[in-house]
């Protein structure tokens, strides 16, 4: 076992210890198929939670998307995301001739699964912000890859935006039934439907808390 493998097991254990990192599969089983998991985004811990909630045998082929400027700023963060999580780095500062999806396209061509957050940025408002177009373009280019919606619950209370120390809170990740890009479906309709598939997985308790004054 390599040091990176050992660190991965340790981090999965810590994530489950602090948050529970319980994965609930509704509409799809945890199978070794190429997938794009797309979820709501509220914390830097989001992709760690999804990764920890996956069965061990799926983690090696499932790569999170990570902001290059943040996750390569520092030797440990860079090593962690590169060696342990095998992250796909994306640049938030882009040139006009740069395709922001190219790293994701390359990973999918190599047979990897991905964890992405179509909002593009974190939100602490409960419901996801409008989805950006990346998911639509990936669905167009890779119709054979399953698109799995996921709802991460309670993680904003573990590590809210701006905080650096996690608080022990039970979290869940609910994986829903796969969606597909319909024949002739336009970008706007697909993104609205994809967002609705994520929101539909929100537990009733969380909906009531969000609606409370």
Kindly give the residue locations of the regions a language model identified.
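Residue-level preference for the first positions of well-ordered beta-strands
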Residues: 34-36, 113-117, 146
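A cross-family acyltransferase "interaction/gating" segment
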Residues: 79, 125-188
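Catalytic core of membrane glycerolipid acyltransferases/transacylases, capturing the structured
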Residues: 31-93
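A short, acidic/glycine-rich surface segment
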Residues: 48-49, 72-75, 99, 156-162
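A charged, well-structured terminal subsegment
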Residues: 100-102, 106, 171-199, 205
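Helix-to-loop junction immediately C-terminal to a conserved catalytic motif
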Residues: 3-5, 10-41
């Amino acid at each position: 076992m390599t040091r990176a493998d050992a660190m991965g097991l340790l981090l999965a254990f810590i994530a489950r210890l602090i948050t529970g990192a319980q994965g609930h599969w509704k509409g799809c089983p945890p199978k070794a198929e190429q997938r794009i998991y797309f979820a709501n985004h509220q914390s830097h811990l989001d992709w760690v939670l999804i990764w920890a909630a996956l069965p061990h045998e799926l983690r090696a082929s499932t790569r999170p998307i990570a902001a290059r400027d943040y996750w390569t700023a520092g030797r440990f963060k860079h090593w962690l995301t590169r060696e342990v999580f095998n992250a796909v780095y994306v640049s938030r500062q882009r040139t006009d001739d740069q395709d922001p999806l190219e790293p994701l396209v390359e990973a999918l061509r190599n047979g990897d699964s991905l964890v992405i957050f179509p909002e593009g940025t974190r939100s602490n408002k409960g419901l996801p912000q409008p989805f950006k177009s990346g998911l639509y373009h990936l669905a167009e280019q890779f119709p054979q890859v399953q698109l799995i919606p996921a709802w991460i619950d309670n993680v904003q209370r573990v590590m809210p935006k701006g905080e650096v120390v996690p608080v022990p809170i039970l979290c869940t990740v609910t994986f829903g039934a796969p969606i597909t890009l319909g024949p002739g479906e336009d970008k706007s309709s697909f993104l609205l439907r994809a967002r609705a598939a994520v929101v539909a997985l929100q537990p009733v308790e969380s909906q009531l808390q969000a609606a409370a004054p």
